[in-house]
Amino acid sequence: MAVPKKRTSMSKKRIRKNLWKKKTYFSIVQSYSLAKSRSFSRGNEHPKPKGFSGQQANK
């Protein structure tokens, strides 16, 4: 069974962790911008949820 010879240093761990965080951050930003562009491509600046008529119900 393969076993690592030495312990990974804290600096290497930190570098690898930061790379992982950076990749996830950019993928989140990209997906958010894509979703934003798709919602605005319909022509509505503020799309309304389904079933919203804009009128208040009478009490």
From Swiss-Prot:
Entry's Gene Ontology BP terms: translation
InterPro entries listed in its UniProt record: Ribosomal_bL32, Ribosomal_bL32_plant/cyanobact, Ribosomal_zn-bd
GO cellular component, one term: chloroplast
Chain positions covered by the region annotation Disordered: 37-59
Gene Ontology molecular-function annotations: structural constituent of ribosome
Compartment(s) of residence: Plastid, Chloroplast
Keywords: Chloroplast, Plastid, Ribonucleoprotein, Ribosomal protein
Record family assignment: Belongs to the bacterial ribosomal protein bL32 family.
PANTHER family with a match to the protein in the record: 50S RIBOSOMAL PROTEIN L32, CHLOROPLASTIC, LARGE RIBOSOMAL SUBUNIT PROTEIN BL32C
Entry protein name: Large ribosomal subunit protein bL32c
Provenance organism: Zea mays
Gene this protein is translated from: rpl32
